[in-house]
Amino acid sequence: MPSVKAPYIYAEENWADDMELAYANVHAMMKSTDENAGSGWFFGQAVLHAQKEPITKWIINDTANHYQWYPFVNAGHFELLKQIKLKQAFPKQASGFSAEFINKFPTYYDTLSNYYKQGIEIVWQRASENAFYRGVPFIWCSNNLTVAFAQQCYWYRTQTGDDSYEALEQANIDWLFGCNPWGTSMVYGLPEWGDTPVDPHSAFTNIKRYPIDGGLVDGPVYNSIYKNLIGIKLYNEDEYATFQSNLAVYHDAEQPGGVS
């Protein structure tokens, strides 16, 4: 049970991806002569945690509670792929975990990259049904999910050389800069000559009107979510009213969650 009474909290549930990234980075910092590097213990623990959460759960469930599965993309897979590819911190005479993973290099490399591919394919099945290639759910922080998914596509493409999903990757980037139903950039001040957010959830702009160029706003949400938000109210006319739909809405106005 949460220890606060606020209606919106950051209730992260997953942890295996964090531990995977931690173990992978500890291994990367070790010299190949280090005893623990030689046994491959930290590397092996990273792989074992990768197996606990092969696909980030919001991708599978097509939804999430507020920050339920943060940080929306598994960076540990990318670190492991780099280390296997470079055989980073592995001794010449490997033993234990490192020997197993080096000897089975193609198998483990393909397995880890396939974790990314499986997640991308799930989103693609949804995205392929609309002109914007939109397969990311319209939940809170949908723009953060969009960035995370584009990052996953990029890491998969650059590590494997498979550009099958490059158009999907680019569509998610384009979405953030105006190729969306509202025709507006989701990044404050970028491009300078375009339609960009002017009233983000930020004390800097709300109180002192300071610019926060480069700030990413939360983005559109399902209409059903918007109608049930607590403490949210539009103080100005909805400039995007013509483009709102029963599916999703976007407002250039203060919303909980704010600029990322």
Regions found by a protein language model. Name each.
Residues 2-6, 53-60, 124-136:
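Acidic/His metal-coordination segments adjacent to aromatic residues that form catalytic metal sites
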Residues 6, 14-41, 45-48, 71-126, ...:
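Aromatic (Trp/Tyr) and acidic
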Residues 11, 61, 65, 69, ...:
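Structural signature of alpha-solenoid helical repeat scaffolds
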